[in-house]
């Protein structure tokens, strides 16, 4: 085996080409440069900092799109910068402060090729052939070595080992043949975000067929779409809500948000239809619709009521907590939690949607990222400190406590629809009896801050142990003093305890 390894090493060295000094990779310069930043990905920033600056030009639907920016890590832009210009895209890279200010990428003139492009393709071809040759040699030698090793150790195997001692092969499929579940499972190990890689996102987005509009609002429309026979939800943002689209895209692509009680993100894309730009956010499709719609049509038993509220609490706890490590996430506060932003799944659980107003916080850097969205939350669900403008806007915990207030109101909405002793209330939104259908900021401030009113708890709740516990829990979410409110994790544990006691009661019966 030692001789075989030595032979393999020699053959690998012979197979791989030895690049000349001028072809060697430049050493990565750890220095960061200030670069001009222009384009959608920059948000409101006009500069960025990275190890390489770039200027790019691409042709999209006949329009030329110019962008400038930076690669924060040198390796990130290595292949992009080496790729020769094509008729549809060109990238120019440089190193130095503001070096891309006066650099403009140019598309190749028809019939001309850029210097070095032929050499580049020749080098790439040689490298590919060499690697293929080396891999074939390696496979042959490994096969011979394994056969010898297996023959030499065959007598040590017991009958069961002989029967099941096979080597698993790797099965590959074309990207176009993959299901969304397979693509998303693979993406968990290929990046820090919770969606697909950017190139796959664009591919998926452009293969979607819109089937029917399932919802409209101030933000835009939600459509049921189809991708290779699978249903997806396509949220099409209006141009005035561009910042919400950008914020959700940013969150999903930078934070590992995958959780059964957070709406599953698939892709995000900017596309052109009917001579206008559309902003798409593509997510999992839940045919049951929003919790708001579901509660108007459906009454709940104790089990389904607890399943709904516990799943919402689990999703909120996952958002609020910071997870450390390579597969970790920043702490996030939702800021617009309400029954219309919660979707009902087929299994009776719920998932939290619409992160357009979310706030992020990282303990390691102590940075609070509130985004750049002028949109405000829903007035009916606003906490007292938001209405009277006493909220500490530079403190992340303040935003989490605002979410807890809103969760208490959602809990009240759900509990009203739970049947006990044959009695159930009609669905009503919070404060339906004291403010108009579309309350103003001042309407809510008077009711919540001045009069300190809270949603009414029906007397019949106190004859049911589950509703009694839920009533106590929601009151602890509605304290006027934000710091006295429960945390999402405490709520989740309390609801789990209530759920477990119900299971125990059933077992005893």
UniProtKB/Swiss-Prot annotation:
PROSITE patterns registered for this protein in UniProt: GS, PROTEIN_KINASE_ATP, PROTEIN_KINASE_DOM, PROTEIN_KINASE_ST
Tissue: Urogenital ridge, testis, ovary, brain and lungs.
Extracellular topological intervals: 21-123
UniProt domain GS: residue ranges: 178-207
Signal peptide: 1-20
One annotated Gene Ontology cellular component of this protein: BMP receptor complex
UniProt keyword Glycoprotein present: yes
Co-factor requirement: Mg(2+); Mn(2+)
UniProt keyword annotation of Kinase present: yes
Catalytic residues identified in the record: 336 (proton acceptor)
Entry-annotated residues carrying Phosphoserine: 501
Ranges for domain Protein kinase: 208-502
Bilayer topology annotation: Single-pass type I membrane protein
Reactions that this protein is recorded to catalyse: L-threonyl-[receptor-protein] + ATP = O-phospho-L-threonyl-[receptor-protein] + ADP + H(+); L-seryl-[receptor-protein] + ATP = O-phospho-L-seryl-[receptor-protein] + ADP + H(+)
Function noted in UniProt: Bone morphogenetic protein (BMP) type I receptor that is involved in a wide variety of biological processes, including bone, heart, cartilage, nervous, and reproductive system development and regulation. As a type I receptor, forms heterotetrameric receptor complexes with the type II receptors AMHR2, ACVR2A ors ACVR2B. Upon binding of ligands such as BMP7 or GDF2/BMP9 to the heteromeric complexes, type II receptors transphosphorylate ACVR1 intracellular domain. In turn, ACVR1 kinase domain is activated and subsequently phosphorylates SMAD1/5/8 proteins that transduce the signal.
Protein name per the record: Activin receptor type-1
Taxonomic path: Eukaryota, Metazoa, Chordata, Craniata, Vertebrata
Domain of life from the UniProt record: Eukaryota
Cytoplasmic side: 147-509
Binding site for ATP: 214-222, 235
Any GO BP annotation: cellular response to glucocorticoid stimulus
Enzyme nomenclature, EC number: 2.7.11.30
Species in which this protein is naturally found: Rattus norvegicus (Rat)
Family designation: Belongs to the protein kinase superfamily. TKL Ser/Thr protein kinase family. TGFB receptor subfamily.
Location relative to the cell: Membrane
């Amino acid at each position: 085996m030692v001789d075989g390894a030595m032979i393999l090493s020699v053959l690998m060295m012979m197979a791989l080409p030895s690049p000349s000094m001028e072809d060697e990779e430049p050493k990565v310069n750890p220095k960061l440069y200030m670069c001009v930043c222009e384009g959608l990905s920059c948000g409101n920033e006009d500069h960025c900092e990275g190890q390489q600056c770039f200027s790019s030009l691409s042709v999209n639907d006949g329009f030329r799109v110019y962008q400038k920016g930076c690669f924060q890590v040198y390796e990130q832009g290595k292949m992009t910068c080496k790729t020769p210009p094509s008729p549809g895209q060109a990238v120019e890279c440089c190193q130095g402060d503001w070096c891309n200010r006066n650099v403009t990428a140019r598309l190749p003139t028809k019939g001309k090729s850029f210097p070095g492009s032929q050499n580049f393709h020749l080098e790439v071809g040689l490298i590919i052939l060499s690697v293929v040759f080396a891999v074939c040699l390696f496979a042959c030698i490994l096969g011979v070595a394994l056969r010898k090793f297996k023959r030499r150790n065959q007598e040590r195997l017991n009958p069961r080992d002989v029967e099941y001692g096979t080597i698993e092969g790797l099965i590959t499929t074309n990207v176009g043949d993959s299901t969304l579940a397979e693509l998303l499972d693979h993406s968990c190990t290929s990046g820090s975000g919770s969606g697909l890689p950017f190139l796959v996102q664009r591919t998926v987005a452009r293969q979607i067929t819109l089937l029917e509009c399932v919802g409209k609002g101030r933000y835009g429309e939600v459509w049921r779409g189809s991708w290779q026979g699978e249903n997806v939800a396509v949220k099409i943002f209006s141009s005035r809500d561009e910042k919400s689209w950008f914020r959700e895209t940013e969150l999903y692509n930078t934070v590992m948000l995958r959780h059964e009680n957070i709406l599953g993100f698939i892709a995000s894309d900017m596309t052109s239809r009917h001579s206008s730009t559309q902003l798409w956010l593509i997510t999992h499709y839940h045919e049951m619709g929003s919790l708001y719609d579901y509660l108007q049509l459906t009454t709940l038993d104790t089990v389904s009521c607890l399943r709904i509220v516990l799943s919402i609490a689990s999703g909120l706890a996952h958002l609020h907590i910071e997870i450390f490590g390579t597969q970790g996430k920043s702490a996030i506060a939702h800021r617009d939690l309400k029954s219309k932003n919660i979707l009902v799944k087929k299994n009776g659980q719920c998932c939290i949607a619409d992160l357009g107003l979310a706030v992020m916080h990282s303990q390691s850097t102590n940075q609070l990222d509130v985004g750049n969205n002028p949109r405000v939350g829903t007035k009916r669900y606003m906490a007292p400190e938001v209405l009277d403008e006493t909220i500490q806007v530079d403190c992340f915990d303040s935003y989490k406590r605002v979410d807890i207030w809103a969760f208490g109101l959602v809990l009240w909405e759900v509990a009203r629809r739970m049947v006990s002793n044959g009695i159930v209330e009609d669905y009503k939104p919070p404060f339906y009896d004291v403010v108009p259908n579309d309350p103003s900021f001042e309407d809510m401030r008077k009711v919540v801050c001045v009069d300190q009113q809270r949603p009414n708890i029906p007397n019949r709740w106190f004859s049911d142990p589950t509703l009694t516990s839920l009533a106590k829990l929601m009151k602890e979410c509605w304290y006027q003093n934000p710091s006295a409110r429960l945390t999402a994790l405490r709520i989740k544990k309390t609801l789990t305890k209530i759920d477990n006691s119900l299971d125990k009661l059933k077992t005893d019966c």
